[in-house]
Amino acid sequence: VRICGKSVGEPSPTKCIRQKMGFISENRKEFGLALNLPIRVNVTHAGLKEIFPSGIVDVKKERRLAEEYRQKLRIATPDIERNVVSLSGGNQQKVVLAKWLSTNSEFLVFDEPTRGIDVGAKEEIHRLIDELARQGVGILMISSDLPEVLTLSDRIYVMREGQIVKEIETVTAETTQEEIIAYATGGDRSDA
């Protein structure tokens, strides 16, 4: 695995965090959150070494950071001490994003970023992804939601059976869902 041209060997969560990478899983409940812990803890736990280099958690600093991300990402909750399990799916997804932003991630992998969230939350996540990209954060989005792919992507890699079969270098108004489906299924591109 190479990150920014440097070989990092076998990836691990620690190596990825050290390389300023974050991963927003499609299964936030299993791989992204500690559901029975407060929002405050979920926001800071991936970056404990960076946020608290002494190894001692400064709860006031932790609260300030969590509150900053609650406001910045518009996480709908009156209290960062609430357990994440009490939040809606869209707000849980924002907590996962806040966790990785608190580590100063320069590259984020979004795996099905809006699966299982309502339309309003979906639009908010799209806005956040777009804003991060404009700020220079590298974004790799894996999605089966083709309208989402077409809306948010500058470049699309179409895969079939684990292999890249097409690179669409510039996404334009002429790029269609049918074209992507044709490449993904091995269909005739002229049908698109």
Report residues per predicted region.
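Glycine-rich phosphate-binding loops of nucleotide-dependent enzymes
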Residues: 1-192
